[in-house]
Amino acid sequence: ASAVDCVRLIDPEARVDIRSSRLLVFDDKTTDGELAKIRHYYINAVESREKDLSVLSDMEQAEVKPVGALEGFREMADSELEPYCKTMGLAMNADDLREVVKYFRSEGRDPYETELRILDTYWSDHCRHTTFTTELEGITVEESFVKEEIEDSLALYLRIRRELGREHKSLCLMDIATIGARYLKQKGLLDDMEVSEENNACSVYIDVDVDGRTEKWLLQFKNETHNHPTEIEPFGGASTCLGGAIRDPLSGRSYVYQAMRVTGAGDIYQKVGDTLEGKLPQSVISKKAAAGYSSYGNQIGLATTHVREVYHDGYVAKRLEVGAVVGAVKAENVRREKPAPGDKIIMLGGRTGRDGIGGATGSSKEHNTKSLETCGSEVQKGNAPEERKLERLFRRPEVTRLIKKSNDFGAGGVSVAIGELADGLDIYLDRVKTKYSGLNSTELAISESQERMAVVVEAKDVETFMRYCLEENIEAVEVADVTDTARMRMFNKDRKVVDLSREFIDSAGARHYAEAKVGEVENRNPF
């Protein structure tokens, strides 16, 4: 993309496509067995493939499938739900799907496939945190030298729940994780925390000395894990871990100036031939992930002040890839307002492609030896210079003061990034700028292509905002209207492909239940 931009600086009308590849040449002494090992080391099927050098083609591998209604969906019996989830590759389970069937029976129609994919994304563990919101029906603490301390902590949690009047709420990991902040807020000890409808990053008010004057600023920080994408495509997974983390405070109007990277890997000295089936070698994951992270950070110009990789056999099952960032913005330059009917939503930044499709649901499912072959589109491709342009745009006070609400494009793409901005929305998918032709409605709705943002502005400010985007060489297009319908509707060339009630989307599917067990703690030194 950067090379194409350079050519267009010389000739703005140029229609060019620049690609790169790696050519390996072997002599006839190389055995088939050695070639197989080399293929496994060099070629990750998630992102690349062997090229027939006699053919030069830019045609896509994937066939474009038209999106239609799922005939007979609302007539499904309970016994058909579980097999249907597997056949369709859904992250939701049979209980969730049962709720979807009930909903469309009440609507008197079968869903479009796009609607089912959107619900699967919204209700995935990645988006609704199913694991953390699962109701715990019982908690057992096994015998160990810290059993008494753990039970005391559990008793303290239950006491605070009663004190806060939250006994009617589900007892779950999410409640345990957030109870401390709720308690401190009730006691008046979190007066410096910013509270708004936007949940892009943790945000606190601070006083900043600027040339001898005290100014009120917002300090924002966020961390992001990209364990799943980095496991299957290390370079792209790690680079977009940083890019995605940056966009969260950025959508909160902050300029990100500092980062931290903490990762976990297995034995990087293990022989390539001993790699588990369906896995990439640990040395490949570790090296390519480091290259991907540093590539993105260097191009966007971000200082990572702490880097640490931990090595443990437990990370063979799943890579740990954590990126954390800190940003800040002058408080008076930030506007937080509830979108109103008639407001417009502008999509700006990178174009939309098939990269990242299914990322939210993919990271919410179990994986097997075939994952590397079937998860090709789930990993996003980063373009740091494009995100740097977004950073420049959002540093301008005259720009941020036009924005009523903002969201970055992460898990779920258009359906979530725009879908979360207001209760009632009409979204026009055919207006979305694409990297190439042929994307259907589902792909346009759930693609997780990187470096994209959505902002809500008043109708009278659209032209002004567009002009500022043009000054920063950023593509921007008006893609949605805020309505008073309390429904999310999507259209593609005047054809309605999504019509879901906000209440049903926000229901997050069926309730989940589990028993929790705190296992025996053997090591007396937790470090």
Task: Please name every model-derived segment.
Residues 417-442:
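Anionic-ligand anchoring segments at beta-strand to alpha-helix junctions in alpha/beta enzyme folds, i.e.
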Residues 452-453:
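Short active-site oxyanion
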Residues 293, 418, 465:
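Aromatic/hydrophobic pocket-lining residues that form π-stacking "cages" and hydrophobic walls in ligand
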Residues 1-367, 373-386, 393-401, 410, ...:
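Core nucleic-acid recognition elements
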